[in-house]
């Protein structure tokens, strides 16, 4: 079945958590495989890791790509102090692999950027510092892989966040996990999302259907009634 609303994605995530399924390693692997299919080993990759689980996905991808021979740099403007648990584990794995992070963008553009700053949960306008960083990334005009949604774009409306609207990451590709919110398929979103791709993270249609309920409505009860 198609997952087309943010609340449906959240319902799937809740059920996965209830079942003990770790989705972040799967998302990071999907992102790393996506990059590896389009960029030769040894190339420079910059992973932008934000303060939430989207940043954790980017950190997993960074760790895997470094292990495959890519030259990977990580930029974490907000630092690791307030990362949620799963993302913190991804940060610890990155550090254990010898990785470091900077708060600032490098002086020179990489071959490819992974945008893991903000995901589908972002509902507020970007602040000035975040907007400045995104503007610099866009000015590089290098390929950008956005995870879930280009940072600064509303997954609910498909429009840039803010009034006046901000300037989201301009992605070459957007790799959505579990489902693609319908708003991201709207014509106005295409300029920011680039080519749309979807990874189901190995979840079966039956699992997705159970998570969102018999009528396709995302409900917490689907997660609550399922044992581990």
From Swiss-Prot:
It is an enzyme of class 5 (isomerase). Keywords: Isomerase, Metal-binding, NAD, NADP, Nucleotide-binding, Potassium. Binds 1 potassium ion per subunit. The keyword NADP applies. K(+) binds at residues 54, 115, 151. Pfam families: YjeF_N (PF03853). It comes from the Bacteria. Signal peptide: none annotated. This is NAD(P)H-hydrate epimerase. The gene is nnrE.
